[in-house]
């Protein structure tokens, strides 16, 4: 795991007190007329830094005045997670914010969005386009299907987060509403909307989701995870 757990109020204060940044990458031609401050990184004819620090440098360009600005946020309070030390498979295009915990051998697929304070257990897969809202918790060896949503709760600070147990399978495009707990070993059918807590070892389906059966050998076989996909 990679981060120190924060409760809702601590996350709110983290965001409120964070320096808001508009990070940019600027490729320019010509010579800078002024020295580069320590807050800006210059590599050849490329500048990296906050726009408020980079913009004055561009105004002082001499000779050619051509430059291209690349940016992906404005006044952002929470940076993206530094993934270099995480012992998991994270595919291109996943958006993971800072203060997220990711367990060993987890898998985060393309297009997944994971907000601040979320926790992902070891061996769990977050499939393509799935969304884990703020403080959402998923246990070990679970699978959150493509397009599924685990609602987040940063505000109100008193609200309880979504908690998903171990060995849970959440089907594609399912939605789990704020504060709901999914018991270990259970299955949420594709497209279900879960508005109430789900006990362990059951299958729920529908809108709103209802228990349709207990887990049996056939269900376990159909929903078994593939360890090979979690090999690093």
Curated annotation (Swiss-Prot):
Gene3D superfamilies: Hexapeptide repeat proteins, Malonyl-CoA ACP transacylase, ACP-binding
UniProt pathway: Amino-acid biosynthesis; L-lysine biosynthesis via DAP pathway; LL-2,6-diaminopimelate from (S)-tetrahydrodipicolinate (acetylase route): step 1/3
Molecular function as annotated in GO: tetrahydrodipicolinate N-acetyltransferase activity
Pfam families: DapH_N, Hexapep, Hexapep_2
Family affiliation: Belongs to the transferase hexapeptide repeat family. DapH subfamily.
EC number in record: 2.3.1.89
EC top class, as a word: transferase
Extent of the signal sequence: none
Gene name for this UniProt entry: dapH
Key words of the record: Acyltransferase, Amino-acid biosynthesis, Diaminopimelate biosynthesis, Lysine biosynthesis, Repeat, Transferase
Catalytic activity as recorded in UniProt: (S)-2,3,4,5-tetrahydrodipicolinate + acetyl-CoA + H2O = L-2-acetamido-6-oxoheptanedioate + CoA
The protein, known as: 2,3,4,5-tetrahydropyridine-2,6-dicarboxylate N-acetyltransferase
GO BP: diaminopimelate biosynthetic process; lysine biosynthetic process via diaminopimelate
Keyword Amino-acid biosynthesis: yes
UniProt entry tagged with the keyword Methyltransferase: no
Cross-referenced InterPro entries: DapH, DapH_N, Hexapep, Hexapep_transf_CS, Trans_hexapeptide_repeat, Trimer_LpxA-like_sf
PANTHER family: 2,3,4,5-TETRAHYDROPYRIDINE-2,6-DICARBOXYLATE N-ACETYLTRANSFERASE, ACETYLTRANSFERASE
Function comment: Catalyzes the transfer of an acetyl group from acetyl-CoA to tetrahydrodipicolinate.
């Amino acid at each position: 795991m990679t981060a120190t757990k924060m409760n809702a109020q601590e996350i709110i204060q983290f965001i409120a007190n964070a320096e808001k940044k508009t990070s940019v990458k600027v490729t320019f031609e010509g010579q800078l007329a002024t020295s580069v401050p320590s807050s800006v990184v210059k590599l050849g004819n490329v500048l990296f830094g906050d726009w408020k620090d980079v913009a004055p440098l561009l105004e002082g360009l001499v000779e050619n005045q051509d430059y291209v600005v690349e940016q992906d946020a404005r006044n952002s309070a929470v940076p993206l997670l530094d993934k270099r030390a995480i012992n998991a498979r994270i595919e291109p295009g996943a958006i993971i914010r800072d203060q997220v915990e990711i367990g060993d051998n987890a898998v985060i697929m393309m297009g997944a969005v994971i907000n601040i304070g979320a926790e992902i257990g070891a061996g769990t897969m977050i499939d393509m386009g799935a969304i884990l809202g703020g403080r959402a918790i998923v246990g070990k060896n679970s699978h959150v299907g493509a397009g599924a949503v685990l609602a987040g709760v940063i505000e109100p600070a008193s609200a309880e987060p979504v908690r998903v147990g171990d060995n849970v399978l959440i089907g594609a495009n399912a939605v789990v509403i704020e504060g709901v707990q999914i018991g270990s070993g259970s299955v949420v059918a594709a497209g279900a909307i879960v508005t109430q807590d789900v006990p362990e070892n059951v299958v729920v389906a529908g809108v709103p989701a209802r228990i349709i059966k207990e887990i049996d050998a056939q269900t376990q076989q159909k929903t078994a995870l593939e360890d090979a996909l979690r090999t690093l």
